[in-house]
Amino acid sequence: MSARTPLHAPPSHEGIAHFPREIRRFFTGEPGQTLLVNGAPGTGKTLFTIRGLDVLSREGDVLYVSTRVDQETVYEMYVEGHAALDRTALLDLSQDPFGLPMDVDVPFETLNLESLLSWVDAISAPATKLTLAFDSWRLVYEYLAARHDSPPSIETVTNQLVALARDAGVRLVLVSETATQSPLEYIVDGVVTLHVTDNERGRTRRQLRLEKLRGVRIENRLQPFTLADGQFKAITPVELSTTQSVPDEATWEPLANPTARFSTGIRDLDTILSGGFNRGGVVHLDLGADLSRDAWSVLVLPAIRNFLANEMGVAVVPPKEGSPGLLHNDLSAVLSKAVFDTHCHVFETYAGPTRDHDDAVDPDRLPGHDTTPTEHGTLSYDPYIARAERIREHSDGPLLHVISMDTAYHAFETRLGDFANYVALHNDASVLITKPGTALRTRADRVADMHFRLECAGDAIVLYGETPLTPLLGIGVDQSGTIPEITLTEMV
């Protein structure tokens, strides 16, 4: 169960960042800033720090300082294959505090709390935009404090170090061993806290909280992240408009349908589901609160595209609040008008202003369609099935049914079990869309063999499976191909 997680996301890729842009702005703004990184053991502080140094190493010199793990171990565990840092950027004070990657004349032989400031001052002189990371700062302090009879407090030493960093233009990262508030937060310029929780099903959720970043506007304090493949990666928002197709003369190749499955149209999701949706199965797409009105299309549009490209029929009852013309405009960008008219029918339900004729889908476009899908202005079950059968006559094999349970409540209120049997009998696939407050939400779950939930995590969008059980999956968009490709990043 492995989704792709490229080391360096190209500019055409949305939804994943290798370092939060707010923290990058914090360090590339006013010189000499100090960042305190809080978090309990196991939250990912070291990987966060290594990733930050990797990013900042492109602009200047960096040095990772520790006292508990030797250089080779740090390199093999956190750096090799994941970052561009050289071994010489990793320093173990307990082994060789003077084994520096730059030529420095240090005016003392033993390092302690008093000489630490002179040491920092000495190595900053020949360096270019130096960034120093102490992991962890308290352990470094305690290691050096043991060489004093009456050592100054960690707050005193931190004050002195932060003042020196400002004067010398050195960027500091001080890693803490706790997520609780400490007096150090009032000394430094920026504070971030890493959190991790596991629910009762073992699903891991990681969040980075931006407590304060001097000189930087924080629009979203909570940012989800992942440590997949041993790398820190932030999960970032995706503009839904970028998930939709635009006209392109290049050839688009649909994904193949395995023998017992239908491709979801999302390569990463097919991998997780061992090929895609079950033939004859029902998928429950459970929408969380605060999603935008077209968020449902992120998972559904790729499947619709793939069905139509394979000349299989699609019947769609979209949410009432969905954008008018969304499906028609997207699909017509990559499929011919003949394919759309012959194999797809959208039951128009938009509750807003009247749409232009060009955006509308004529309910009688399909040849021989003489049955209206509504009774007394409301979608009804039997006319829906009759229309689906008309689509089947002009398509190659099974159908995909995409149905908003809010929109189709009256049609399926007492017929959901019948519909599931119909889907199984014809070897079709169906996606039932529900949202908070949907009356048929529980019933949809009972007839479904797959249950996915789409929800907000900060400003980002994440997907996860309840059946089958999956980790949180950050949603991204790769726009380097003919059409936008949805990507999924495991959040572990």
From Swiss-Prot:
Keywords: ATP-binding, Cytoplasm, Nucleotide-binding, Plasmid
GO cellular component, one term: cytoplasm
UniProt-annotated location(s): Cytoplasm
Pfam family for this entry, one: GvpD_bR2
Compositionally skewed regions (Basic and acidic residues) per UniProt: 355-368
Effect of gene knockout: Transformed H.volcanii still makes gas vesicles.
InterPro entries reported in the protein's UniProt record: GvpD_bR2, GvpD_P-loop, P-loop_NTPase
Induction: In PHH4 (a deletion of the p-vac locus) detected from exponential to stationary phase, most protein seen in exponential phase (at protein level). Transcribed in all growth phases, maximal expression in mid-stationary phase. An unstable 6kb transcript able to cover gvpD-gvpE-gvpF-gvpG-gvpH-gvpI-gvpJ-gvpK-gvpL-gvpM is detected, as well as smaller transcripts. Also expressed strain PHH1, which has an intact p-vac locus, from exponential to mid-stationary phase (at protein level). Gas vesicles appear earlier when grown in static culture, possibly due to O(2)-limitation.
Source organism, top-level taxon: Archaea
GO molecular function: ATP binding
Biological function: Causes a decrease in the amount of GvpE protein. Gas vesicles are hollow, gas filled proteinaceous nanostructures found in several microbial planktonic microorganisms. They allow positioning of halobacteria at the optimal depth for growth in the poorly aerated, shallow brine pools of their habitat. Expression of 2 c-vac DNA fragments containing 2 divergently transcribed regions (gvpE-gvpF-gvpG-gvpH-gvpI-gvpJ-gvpK-gvpL-gvpM and gvpA-gvpC-gvpN-gvpO) allows H.volcanii to produce gas vesicles.
Subunit structure: Homodimer. Interacts with GvpE, also with GvpE from H.mediterranei.
Record-given protein name: Protein GvpD2
Organism listed in the record: Halobacterium salinarum (strain ATCC 700922 / JCM 11081 / NRC-1) (Halobacterium halobium)
Lineage of the species this protein comes from: Archaea, Methanobacteriati, Methanobacteriota, Stenosarchaea group, Halobacteria
Gene that produces this protein: gvpD2
